[in-house]
């Protein structure tokens, strides 16, 4: 079956990346066609499939959301370095990131999930801290998704295509266009945006911590 939403799959009880599935305490990588078999079931993850090898611009979000099972850094050492560099602020980020892994449970109970607002002087390391925390899930591009320049449909897509994960919206300012400010109003309550599709109102959910 096709895996359209990455991250936590509550029905199948596994965590999906674009290059494989983590289940039963181990990582199952995709084959050359993007197929991965877990137990008796097979799943299709198209981002790195040979079928799409010539599609350089497609699956741009999914291709950053991949797992490196050979990583040598332990979670303990990773968190220790964040706290060493960022102190108490780093501790808050770690706590929030761990909560994001269980976002569906928290949101299901309280009907909201807190946003993490990293603020400070220019050059103080806000974006790098966000990138560090997000590296638990992503191999990030050099430039994170911009509040001002990334199109609203793309922001909505990215916010709803990984469950129980983290998503960075970079460079928030108070002079953003009203349509973009409206996105932030909905994030707390779990809605990225609404649209009409074939005359039917569709709500795009937020499935990750922001």
Identify the function of each model-found stretch.
Residues 91, 100-210:
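Conserved NTP-binding/hydrolysis core of motor NTPases
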Residues 1-86:
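Extended, charged/polar low-complexity intrinsically disordered regions
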Residues 27-29, 94, 196:
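Generic alpha-helix signal with a bias toward terminal, lower-confidence helices
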């Amino acid at each position: 079956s096709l895996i359209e939403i990455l991250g936590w799959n509550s029905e199948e009880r596994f965590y999906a990346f674009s290059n494989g599935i983590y289940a039963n305490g181990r990582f199952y990588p995709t084959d050359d066609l993007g197929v991965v078999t877990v137990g008796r079931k097979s799943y299709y993850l198209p981002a790195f499939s040979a079928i799409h090898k010539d599609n350089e611009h497609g699956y741009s979000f999914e291709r950053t959301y991949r797992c490196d099972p050979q990583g040598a850094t332990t979670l303990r050492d990773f968190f220790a370095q964040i706290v060493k560099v960022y102190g108490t602020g780093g501790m808050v980020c770690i706590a929030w990131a761990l909560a994001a892994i269980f976002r569906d449970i928290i949101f299901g109970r309280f009907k909201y999930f807190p946003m993490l607002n990293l603020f400070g002087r220019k050059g103080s390391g806000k974006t790098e801290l966000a990138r560090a925390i997000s590296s638990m899930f992503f191999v990030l591009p050099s430039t994170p998704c911009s509040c001002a320049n990334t199109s609203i449909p793309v922001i909505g897509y990215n916010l709803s295509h990984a469950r129980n994960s983290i998503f960075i919206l970079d460079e928030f300012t108070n002079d953003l266009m009203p349509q973009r400010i409206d996105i932030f109003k909905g994030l707390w309550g779990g809605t990225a945006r609404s649209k009409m599709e074939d005359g039917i109102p569709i709500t795009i959910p937020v499935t990750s911590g922001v």
